[in-house]
């Protein structure tokens, strides 16, 4: 796994940039940054949305209805963001829909798909702390992540990102 990623990282094409899709404001910056890098390096984008199962621990019928609604919302968010990725890069992204703890599922996905060569996350710059995924991946989860992590500040404009990429 590691050897394959090392060989891909030296190439100017074939890189896959993983972006975790959620409803945060900083998703825009992370995804725009990833698209600009992928376009420049002839790479691809992978989008992952993770449905948290703890949201469905109610009565069986209500829980199942909530699960279906969450899946519809996830599929819609992936569709909308996939269209934007295609508009920015000219390529359709790889799309992953998972259920579980995002901290676990992002590591699992990276370990399963050796094409993924970098993880791009957006950071909340309006609050007092980062989100739970960034907090985890920059502390004890860092040892589990086999690819570099790029954290894009949520206060960057598209023009700022254009200059950086």
Q: PLM features: what roles do these ranges have?
A:
Residues 7-61:
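Small/aliphatic-rich secondary-structure junction motif
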Residues 7, 49-76, 159-165:
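Acidic, proline/glycine-rich short linear motifs
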Residues 118-143, 156-162:
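Glycine-rich, Arg-bearing micro-motifs that act as flexible, cationic patches
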Residues 30, 57-60, 107-108, 131-132, ...:
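Short, well-ordered secondary-structure micro-motifs
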Residues 1-8, 86-119, 159, 165:
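Structural beta-alpha unit
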Residues 15, 116-118, 146:
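Conserved acidic residues
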Residues 46-48, 94-98, 150-152:
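General small-molecule cofactor/ligand-binding pocket signal
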